[in-house]
A protein has these predicted regions:
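Catalytic alpha/beta core domains of metabolic enzymes, predominantly
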Residues: 1-136
Length: 138
């Protein structure tokens, strides 16, 4: 079996896994699903399939979603730009955590929190900016 390339196939696997977890009494809040991010350099629909899968997981199972966000840009130039855009879309779709470069994308995450109304008076965004500026100054 190859890597799943459609949201429907992934959904089928997730339903099987979810049912198995429930049969063992594992609550949804203790489950973290990783939808396997593939590079858009090899499949232009890979990012979109992942975003659809994230939405499906949050809607149907209510579990946490983890993803290797930087996989999406593998083999492409200006990976950081692609990663930033994808991370914003993934968080909007419902991703709860990401495996990524914490220094390069931490300010992006803070900006997303700010724009989603989760950072009163931009306090965390400004603090992160200052912390990163201090690191660069060393």
């Amino acid at each position: 079996m190859g890597i799943a390339v459609t949201c429907d196939f992934v959904a089928e696997l997730l339903h099987l896994s979810h049912n198995m977890g429930q049969s063992f009494g594992i609550p949804a809040e203790d489950v973290v699903i990783d939808p396997l991010v593939l590079t858009v350099g090899a499949d232009s629909k890979a990012g979109w399939v992942t975003l659809q899968t994230i939405e499906l997981v949050r809607r149907e199972f209510g579990t946490n979603v983890n993803l290797g966000a930087s996989n999406v840009s593998f083999g492409l130039p200006e990976r950081h730009t692609i990663n930033q855009a994808f991370l914003g879309l993934a968080i909007g779709a419902g991703a709860s955590c990401a495996i990524t470069d914490p220094i390069k994308l931490s300010l992006t995450v803070r900006a997303l929190d700010l724009l989603r109304g989760r950072d009163d008076f931009a306090g965390r965004y400004i603090k992160q900016f200052r912390d990163l500026s201090a690191l660069e100054g060393k």
